[in-house]
From Swiss-Prot:
Protein name: ATP-dependent protease ATPase subunit HslU
MF terms in GO: ATP binding; ATP hydrolysis activity; peptidase activity; proteasome-activating activity
Organism encoding this protein: Listeria innocua serovar 6a (strain ATCC BAA-680 / CLIP 11262)
Signal peptide: none
Gene behind this protein: hslU
Residues covered by region (Disordered): 159-179
Length: 469
């Protein structure tokens, strides 16, 4: 199912309901993002003459950390399988300085988009790819005597590998005995009897980790050069010993890749990134420039001016082709404790017409976060201890007390929102998680007294609270 089909099925109200399953409160932010998403679907249905005139209304989320800014954007991208990339504005530097190039956010988005499209296409060819992979695996488990190849190899081929190297193995001699053996292996393979056997397979070597490091240190051009050079020579292969279970996955991916048109994959990946992509720019308040900032102000303003043309719409070169950023939805977010949105350069402010102020979390919100979402923290800890054969039970009073402590600690020290619950629950259940394998009990009840016993000594000491909770 494509993301356009998914959006067709979901109204803004239904999108908000889906977000409610994971995120408590922040109704205004959910509505704005849901409307922005639905507008993208509406735009796809318009005549081409007016479609190009309608650009996404970018969103600026304002609110303290831990209230759900990132989670709203990430969840909505998952709901409709839209390409989504999260970047931190503080990682970027002006052109000419050491740091990440702002264009890398678009390249990251295209990588995600191509991967999504590839996953969908692999599902379409799954049956044929699995059949081909099984044939290869059977031949590896029951090899034959290959006919000797008499073709000589010139020195350049010996050095770089043949440019027209066939993927298929050399012609083989198959007698009746080998056919019978392979038939038996095929039956055992399909019944999972050989899953733990060891087999040697050829896999493509991963790219040099040095180039991966360069992607994160601002030398994106160098990693781009490596991508270009990698296409000039055939990929090197190395032999690995793996289980049959793992070999099935490796050979399936290899066979599926052969059945997918790489040019079509790149074109569709770029199109989806352009039309459906979402880029979340976090900590944008950290690059807001204020008067009297000196060199730091100049640098921050420079980053804003580098981001501006991408948000406005420009052509960015990637290894898959050129990407037009005009119709990508940008969602920026920041706490704006030390600055305000008006500290951003006017041109950039104008590119984020929808402003949403997210609410601070209340004690009641903390209680709901602990109990209501599908991925609620308490449900997660229950599932963890269930693997040890222990039913973990929280009384209502215990959960209320945890919510009260989380709210109070946020009030007394730095407000880190819902992330405070992670710290408190980890401290509360630390001993239980450590001793669980040795505990011979079917169920354990966490009461209000237990919460007070574990957390009260820390709560009464302000210094300990700041360091531990």
């Amino acid at each position: 199912m494509t993301n356009l089909t998914l959006m067709n099925q979901l109204t803004p109200k239904q999108i908000v309901e889906k977000l409610d399953q994971y995120i408590i409160g922040q109704t205004g932010a959910k509505k704005s993002v849901a409307v922005a998403l639905r507008n993208r679907y509406r735009r796809q249905l318009m005549d081409e003459s007016i479609r190009d005139e309608i650009i996404p209304k970018n969103i600026l989320m304002i609110g303290p950390t831990g209230v759900g800014k990132t989670e709203i954007a990430r969840r909505i991208a998952k709901i409709v399988r839209a390409p989504f990339s999260k970047v931190e504005a503080t990682k970027f530097t002006e052109v000419g300085y050491v740091g990440r190039d702002v264009e890398s956010m678009v390249r990251d988005l295209v990588e995600v988009s191509v991967r999504l499209v590839k996953e969908e296409k692999m599902q379409l060819v799954r049956v044929k790819a699995e059949k081909n992979a099984e044939k290869r695996l059977i031949k590896l488990l029951a090899p034959s005597q290959k006919k000797k190849q008499t073709t000589s190899q010139n020195p350049l081929e010996a050095l770089f590998g043949s440019m027209n190297q066939p993927d298929e193995p050399a012609e083989e001699e198959v007698d009746q005995e080998l056919k019978n053996k392979r038939s038996q292996i095929e039956w055992r393979l399909q019944n999972g009897e050989l899953d733990d056997e060891i087999v040697t397979v050829e896999v493509k070597e991963q790219q040099n980790p040095m180039f991966d490091m360069m992607r994160g240190t601002g030398m994106d051009q160098m990693s781009g050069m490596q991508d270009a050079l990698s296409g000039m020579f055939p990929a090197k292969k190395k032999k690995r010993k793996v289980t049959v279970r793992e070999a099935k996955k490796i050979l399936f991916e290899d066979e599926a890749s052969k059945l997918i048109d790489s040019d079509e994959l790149a074109a569709e990946g770029i199109h989806r990134a352009e039309q459906m992509g979402m880029i979340f720019i976090d900590e944008i308040d950290k690059i807001a420039s204020k008067e009297g900032g000196g060199n730091a102000q100049v640098s921050r303003e420079g980053v804003q001016r580098d981001i501006l043309p991408i948000v406005e719409g420009s052509q960015i070169s990637t290894k898959y082709g050129t990407v037009n950023t005009e119709y990508i939805l940008f969602i920026a977010a920041g706490a704006f404790h030390m600055s305000k949105p008006s500290d951003l350069i006017p041109e950039l402010q104008g590119r984020f017409p929808i402003r949403i102020e997210l609410d601070k979390l209340t004690q009641e919100d903390f209680y709901k976060i602990l109990t209501e979402p599908d991925n609620a923290l308490i449900k997660q800890y229950k599932a963890l201890l269930k693997t040890e054969g222990i039913d973990l039970i929280f009384t209502k009073e215990a959960v209320e007390r945890i919510a009260e402590i989380a709210f109070q600690v946020n009030q007394d020290s730095d407000n880190i929102g819902a992330r405070r619950l992670h710290t408190i629950l980890e401290k509360l259940l630390e001993d239980l998680l450590f001793e669980a394998p040795e505990i011979n009990m079917e169920s354990i009840k966490v009461t209000e007294n237990y919460v007070n016993e574990k957390l009260a000594p820390i709560m009464t000491n302000k210094d300990l609270t700041q360091f531990i909770l």
